[in-house]
Regions:
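Bacterial N-terminal signal peptides that target proteins for export
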Residues: 3-19
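Bacterial N-terminal signal peptides
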Residues: 16-28
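Sec/Tat signal peptide C-region and signal peptidase I cleavage site
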Residues: 30-34
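N-terminal mature ectodomain segment of secretory-pathway/periplasmic proteins
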Residues: 35-118, 144-182, 186-193
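Acidic/charged, solvent-exposed loop-and-adjacent secondary-structure segments enriched in E/D, K/R, S/T
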Residues: 114-133
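Surface-exposed amphipathic alpha-helical segments
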Residues: 184-186, 193, 197-216, 322-347
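Short, gly/Ser/Thr-rich active-site loops of penicillin-recognizing serine hydrolases
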Residues: 211-240, 347
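Short, solvent-exposed recognition patches
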Residues: 227-319, 331-336
């Protein structure tokens, strides 16, 4: 058996080596006992934890700073969330790196401020699974395609957290590792892992305060006081892509269509009107795949594929249309999905 040599002291915090080792042993034991031998109990606990994470993002008061990491990209944001009993949710999300951006939200009404253009984009929120929210469906449905592992306790941003790993049951999706606040269930850190366990993307609070009073007034006032800003309301509307002749039925377990919409996209050619683009979004509860359809005649591009962190993109041509698939899934998943897409014009 290999011998492990320990230093007499650890320089971080100047803690005795004995205390450091004891903490490590306790953590390991906690993880071992947390998983247990009962898969039914593990699945039930994991489903409850997932649902609690999603509910906490909507029902808790919190404010803090979180960091998004993907490859060499590191971006910090400040978030404030107030959950009121009679007046819904108020949220402020502000970028701290790069060009300034601020998003203010009251329930599903979103106001995105772009200072360098003195622009305010007003639109309805389309997705409710942005960090620190998580799910696009129930925790039980997520576990139909992911295998849960309860990994015990840890600490994130100074708070005690419970750790859950979700391993895919197939090769169509990535694994996830989640840290949730032990007291409230709020998601503190989320990692997307490749098949080798390497981190592709991470979102993590570096500082957060949960509970107590959060003043909604600055958010409400910011929403009301838009004088001097150019207000833009993109005309987003629901669309029935199947009625138009599109057959979008992914032969990938777990993915369900959660919404379809049409929105204008700026033309690549100066002086040309916006291009109508149809979008269908499919989700397995954690990962999402978007399918964009736009006419070839109004957009010059090429077929191809690419990736950035966990996000992959695939561009294909189907007759007179460009099909773009975008999602936090392996490239092979997009390829398989694309192979099933058909267009049969309605007569």
């Amino acid at each position: 058996m290999q011998r492990v040599r320990l230093n007499k002291t650890t320089y971080w915090g100047r803690l005795p080596a004995l205390m450091f080792c004891a903490a490590a042993l306790i953590s390991a034991a906690s993880g071992a006992f947390a998983q247990g031998d009962d898969p039914v109990a593990t699945r039930r606990a994991a489903a409850e934890m997932l649902n609690r994470i999603h509910e906490a993002a909507q029902q808790q008061n919190y404010e803090g700073t979180f960091v998004y990491q993907r490859g060499a990209t590191v971006q910090s944001s400040r978030i404030t969330h107030a959950a009121t009993r009679g007046d819904g949710e108020y949220e402020s999300l502000e970028s701290l790196d790069g060009k300034p951006r601020k998003m203010l939200r009251h329930d599903d009404d979103m106001y995105t401020f772009v200072p360098e253009r003195h622009l305010c984009v007003v639109e309805k929120r389309q997705n409710k699974d942005s960090f620190p929210a998580l799910l696009a469906t129930s925790g039980e449905q997520v576990l139909s395609v992911y295998e849960p592992k309860l990994l015990g306790s840890d600490r994130v941003a100074g708070l005690d957290a419970q750790v859950l790993e979700l391993d895919p049951k197939d090769s169509y999706r990535f694994a996830y590792k989640l840290w949730a606040d032990s007291k409230t269930g709020l998601l503190l850190r989320a990692q997307t892992l490749d098949p080798d366990g390497q981190v592709l993307e991470q979102l993590s609070f570096s500082q957060v305060r949960i509970g107590g009073g959060v003043d909604k007034a600055p958010i409400a006032n910011g929403i009301r006081n838009t004088a001097g800003w150019t207000i833009v309301r993109p005309p987003v509307q629901p669309v029935d892509m199947e009625a138009q002749g599109w057959q979008l039925t992914p032969n990938i377990p777990g993915f369900r269509k959660i919404r379809e919409l049409r929105r204008p996209m700026a033309s690549r050619e100066e002086g040309q009107p916006p291009i109508p683009v149809d979008q269908a979004v499919f989700s397995d509860g954690l990962a999402a795949i978007s399918v964009f359809v736009e006419p070839v005649e109004k957009n010059s591009r090429k077929e191809g594929a690419g990736s950035n962190g966990a996000t992959h993109v695939l561009v294909k041509r189907r007759g007179d249309f460009w099909i773009t698939l975008l999602g936090e899934v392996p490239q092979a998943t997009l390829q398989q999905f694309a192979s099933t897409i058909e267009y049969k014009p309605s007569k």
